[in-house]
Amino acid sequence: GAEMCIVKQNWVLKDIFITYVSLWKGIYLAAKSLNSNIMIKKILTVAMLVCTCSSSLAQPHVNDGTSYLMNQALDMSTDFLDLSNTLFFADHLESFDVKSGEGLVNWKRGHLMPRQAFNTNGAQPRKMRMLDFPFTAYENDPNLKFKIDFVTPRTVRIRMLTTPVEPKVSTSIMLAKEPGKDESWKVTETENTIVYAGNYGTVQINKNPWRVVLKDKTGRILSQTVTLRDADSTQVKYTPFSFIKRGSDNARRINPVFTLTADEMIFGCGESATGLNKVGQKVNLFVTDPQGPETDQMYKPIPFFMSNRGYGMFMHTSAPVTCDFGATYIGLNKMFMGDENLDLFVFFGEPKDILDEYTDLVGKPGMPPLWSFGTWMSRITYFSEKEGYDVAANIRKNKYPCDVIHFDTGWFDVDWQCDYKFSENRFQNPQQMLKDLKSQGFHVCLWQLPYFTPKNRYFPELIKKDMYVKNGNGELPYEDVVLDFSNPETVNWYQNKLAGLLNIGVSAIKVDFGEAAPLNGIYASGKSGWYEHNLYPVRYDMAVSEITKKLHNENIMWARAAWAGSQRYPLHWGGDAATTNTGMLGTLRAGLSFGLSGFSFWSHDMGGFVKSTPEDLYCRWLPFGFLTSHTRAHGAPPTEPWLYDSKRVQDVFRKSAEMKYRLMPYVYAQAKECTEKGLPMLRALFVEFPDDPGAWKVDDEYLFGSQILVAPLLESGITLSLIHI
């Protein structure tokens, strides 16, 4: 196959060369016979154009790919259908030590060959003889490391390399601790199988063809890997368990592929607003700013999911990932990873077991302070000390329960120009204001962000001190400075700025943005944005949470972006929802999905963010907002109930707030359990009722904690809806 392609290409190039020689010979004879300098120039110009066009057509067109706008989600599946890339298919187990769980898998080199059949072009995988040079330096079908570890009685770790080079040992900030080693699994070996049996599941490794089979404790197959030998067609309907070597840069990308069954449902993957069950969807795990929870992009993608069949998976990588859950082939779960190696944790059990195991690995949240569960009053934005006092007075005058007043982008001299300093013109004595508000029972939260425009007063200092993410030339990749939180000196500088605010009485920091870390940037960690982009919110959240904990001994912040590891730092909110029914539905689905991804605490802007909220929508959204772990009124004004002419809005706001405050003993007790077991406060029904088939299909209701069923009214003009009980 490959050799024939090269021979044909060589003949084509030879034909082109002969054509060029003939063309130039004809031009020379024509010009000589005309004996005209002007005509010679014209003929030569035409000839040059012809040759240029022919030359461009003769070049192989590779790595066409897809063009992306900056910091938009990446689809990692496209690489695996690029004909310029070399594929390696997992084939058989070359060797294996059952005691250490370590061995070698043989990978067959191949590529996709175009195939025309009855006027339809497809592609077929074909084995390929290596053309790499020198031949003695490389393997045609390499044997590469495969390792399986048993972390707990419910957790298994599967690792695979795509090169002979072992990765450097480094600490992962996604993990809360180094995975342990459990000795309870028993191993047996036959001629073609190795079986590790545990109390909650079984892992079977088939030798030839190589296959990993996951079973529950009764022996029922939950899922298994898929090889090239399983292909069911002459065309490529799917790519099996494989990795690629890209023709453009020799980078490797791995694609673990597992089966999906007919009745299977998949949940998780972060704060996703699309259908709660991800089967039939392609989910791109890449931190971005979707400007609201109404699309398939996410502020908080998480490389973790669980199945209704009794298992979950955590893809331990910070590279971009695309999960194809039966979207392009209904029977397969394909995890197209931007990483060259596989590090996959598998969990066995019911949803509660899986969440507990997963959050043991990546970390459980600290308990937020009691006051944080109360009402947060805000808008975009309060601009002055006077507005702060006025809001506080109106809250108390109208008897709305409230614990927090938030100042968004307007507390600086210039709106949105973060310099960690209250405007002297509009905040005459901020420290006294904070003290006065505290005496009235209010905590204060302040907005900020990690980007510095050229007009920001800290811009020159950050450039001088090299505290920013750089491009390949050591300069700014954007017009703005993006703080490099992988640099300890940057973290120290940043935390000192926040400490100045926390020390004068500020209670919490809003950790806004964090989704735009340069993908092609170079970071102080020594890694590129390919691995640091998705980690950026974890580092950002960590920096804010740790300084707040150090100075106030409280686990609190208000963050928008997240990745695996961020769940240790409560809390996060749902971003800039549209002030529409769609915005409300997307917010509910996003919150449920986020909770199924290991996050206990979450909030959202009641009524939406983008525009002023219609009365009917606000009244339907308020009970949903107050029956969430954390509650905030925020967005385009008015958000304050007393500014609505409608008595209905005022009454619904007050009654909803009073309801939550009466429930506070329940709320706090449930929250404490969530920190211990990794459970979400906003809980999908099947978490509590996994044996109810109908509960797995509900995405417009939820449990607030374990005992309160909530069914928000998601349509205009309705007062009742059918619910699943």
Give the location of each predicted region.
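Extreme N-terminal basic, low-complexity initiation segments
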Residues: 2-9
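Conserved small/polar residues in nucleotide/adenosyl-binding loops
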Residues: 5, 723-725
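Bacterial Sec-dependent N-terminal signal peptides
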Residues: 11-60
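Catalytic and substrate-binding clefts that recognize carbohydrates or anionic sugar/phosphate headgroups
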Residues: 61, 138-140, 161-163, 179-369, ...
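A low-complexity, Ser/Thr/Gly/Pro-enriched, surface-exposed linker/loop concept
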Residues: 67-192, 234
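Carbohydrate-binding surfaces of carbohydrate-active enzymes
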Residues: 126-143, 147-150, 158, 163, ...
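Aromatic- and carboxylate-enriched substrate-binding clefts and catalytic-loop regions
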Residues: 161-163, 170-173, 401-653, 688-690, ...
